[in-house]
Design a protein with these regions (language model features):
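Acidic/polar, glycine-enriched structural segments that form the non-catalytic walls/loops
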Residues: 1-137, 155-168
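Well-ordered alpha-helical segments within folded domains of soluble proteins
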Residues: 141-151
Length: 168
């Protein structure tokens, strides 16, 4: 493995495990470095299968709380890009509606946890480094909309980071 200021290169390998520990000093200006080093050290002490298993269990503890079955459709077997194109012509795809519902839950689950910051205006789904409005927190409808699904999709605790942010 070779690392430079702008790249990481892996050659002649069948696999590579790259561990990254990222965070913010939004709440703790002095302790973020130790916090990140602790999490990286914990991750380094585990093999990939353990890390994956622990991540999957944590994710599924939230995601598996809800299932939504709106019925089977003729397009259930299609790749998503074909389904979306077909949906533009004919809205009769109950499975796509259920998939979209679960995608919204996935975005919220993936963007926050108790004790962390809530998703910002762009969340983690922005496709650029320089986000519109700098990905700021504005306590208006835009930030609130990120949290609308929390209660109705059985992810109540995921709106708590927003409450904590507004308290501070």
């Amino acid at each position: 493995m070779t690392a430079t200021d702008s790249s990481l290169s892996v050659r002649s390998a069948s696999e590579a495990i790259i561990l990254v520990s990222l965070g913010t000093d939004y709440f703790d200006k002095d302790g973020v470095g130790q916090f990140l080093e602790k999490y990286l050290s914990q991750a380094e002490s585990k093999d990939f299968s353990t890390l994956r298993r622990e991540h999957t269990l944590a994710y599924r503890s939230l995601f598996d709380r809800v299932s939504l079955d709106l019925g089977k459709g003729e397009r259930d077997h299609l790749p998503i890009h074909e389904r979306l194109a077909a949906f533009a012509q004919d809205k009769n795809d109950p499975g796509l509606a259920a998939l979209y519902f679960q995608f919204g839950r996935y975005l919220l689950i993936s963007s926050t946890r108790q004790g962390l910051l809530p998703p910002n205006l762009q969340g983690l789904w922005c496709n650029t480094i320089h986000t519109p409005w700098n990905g700021d927190y504005h306590l208006n409808i835009n930030l609130q909309m990120n949290h609308w699904p929390a209660e109705v999709t059985n992810l109540s605790e995921l709106h708590l980071p927003l409450i904590e942010l507004t308290k501070q």
